[in-house]
């Protein structure tokens, strides 16, 4: 609608302009865009690791973006929040590396490149959170690390009333380094005459007003009774939204589900007793070793964990990992069953007949898919439906 008002409407990645963060944003305006884009070849790139290394110095810290140095004691907001708990680590790892729908991400984040995009809001267990190794575990970034990744000088102060408000200030900002280069293009600075901020003798004085210390993020101690659980089962995650998952419908009814199809047309089938009765004779007829003992042991261990039981421990303050242990054991059991069946004798048309359509991805993974139908339908009936 307003396109005619601007000569330039283009998406830029700030990492191309030396910011140690991948940050793609649309910019509209009137400036020499070809000149701006030509700067990319002359701008030195900074990786995530360089930022972390600079900020870990004990005596003198050098600003990785602007090049000036100040005593480490003068740098504020370097306090780290508590490491992720084991449950928080598992949730983050699964959300990033085995998300039920979206593409996989690294966990922890890779340091040999610019960081992922800093966001204004993220919790300790969000897919968007940037997670790095810490002593004895994993942690989120502190305020200063985020500020430097966003291009703010070491001496810049964030006068927020809370930890979350400072995160919002940083995450909602336009990187100063990108605006510097846009301004240089508007000044028509030639590419070969361009100076990087580190070479421009820039120094941002420390303000006289002291920044208020923030209460750092901590693990949750209480969870609502309606806390949700939605995670794919190990060995039953096939990418592009195709997966078996354990989740709690209506916040209390726990069950295994199977999803397939495209991102625009997700489908599912019911993992119920009828499906189990259809699959069981085929599986048992073609088994090459006895795996029923493992299944019976699994059912026996979780016989007292009804849907309510799983929900009770999932919202408990102790952060009992029962649900994750359950899906891990289920995944191991799936792997054992897959290796105990003579699959050559099972018709490739079985899956298309069950879902009433042909699906190459499901057929290519028929061993795991059919095992999932068999085992998870049984567990829905014997454990979760009680």
Describe every region a protein language model picked out:
Residues 1-111:
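Class I S-adenosyl-L-methionine
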Residues 80-386:
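C-terminal target-recognition/interaction regions appended to catalytic cores
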């Amino acid at each position: 609608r307003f396109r005619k008002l601007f000569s330039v409407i283009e998406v830029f990645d700030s990492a191309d302009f030396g910011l140690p963060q991948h940050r793609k944003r649309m910019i509209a305006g009137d400036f020499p865009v070809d000149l701006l884009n030509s700067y990319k070849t002359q701008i030195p790139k900074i990786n995530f690791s360089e930022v972390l290394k600079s900020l870990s110095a004990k005596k003198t810290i050098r600003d990785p973006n602007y090049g000036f140095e100040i005593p480490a004691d003068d740098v504020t907001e370097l306090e780290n929040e508590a490491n992720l708990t084991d449950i928080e680590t598992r949730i983050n790892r699964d959300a990033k590396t085995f998300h039920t729908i979206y593409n996989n991400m690294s966990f922890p984040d890779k340091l040999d490149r610019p960081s992922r995009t800093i966001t204004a809001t993220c919790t300790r267990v969000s897919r968007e959170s940037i997670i790095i190794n810490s002593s004895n575990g994993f942690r989120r970034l502190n305020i200063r690390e985020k500020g430097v990744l966003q291009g703010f000088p070491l001496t810049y102060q964030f006068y927020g009333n809370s930890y979350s408000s400072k995160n919002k200030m940083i995450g909602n900002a336009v990187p100063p380094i990108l605006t510097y280069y846009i301004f240089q293009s508007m000044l028509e600075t030639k590419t070969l005459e361009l100076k990087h901020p580190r070479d421009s003798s820039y120094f941002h004085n420390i303000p006289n007003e002291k920044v208020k210390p923030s209460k750092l993020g901590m693990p949750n101690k209480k969870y609502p009774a309606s806390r949700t659980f939605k995670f794919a089962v190990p060995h039953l995650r096939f990418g592009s939204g195709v997966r078996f998952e354990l989740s709690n419908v209506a916040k209390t009814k726990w069950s295994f589900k199977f999803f397939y199809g495209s991102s625009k047309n997700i489908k599912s089938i019911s993992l119920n007793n009828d499906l189990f009765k259809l699959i069981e004779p085929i599986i048992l007829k073609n088994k090459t070793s006895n795996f029923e003992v493992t299944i019976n042991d699994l059912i026996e261990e979780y016989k007292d964990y009804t849907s309510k039981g799983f929900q009770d421990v999932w919202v408990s303050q102790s952060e009992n990992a029962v649900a994750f242990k359950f899906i891990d054991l289920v995944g191991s059991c799936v792997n054992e069953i897959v290796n105990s069946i003579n699959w050559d004798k099972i018709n490739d048309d079985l899956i298309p007949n069950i879902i009433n359509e042909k699906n190459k991805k499901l057929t290519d993974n028929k061993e795991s898919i059919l095992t999932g139908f068999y085992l998870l339908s049984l567990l829905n009936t014997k454990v979760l439906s009680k």
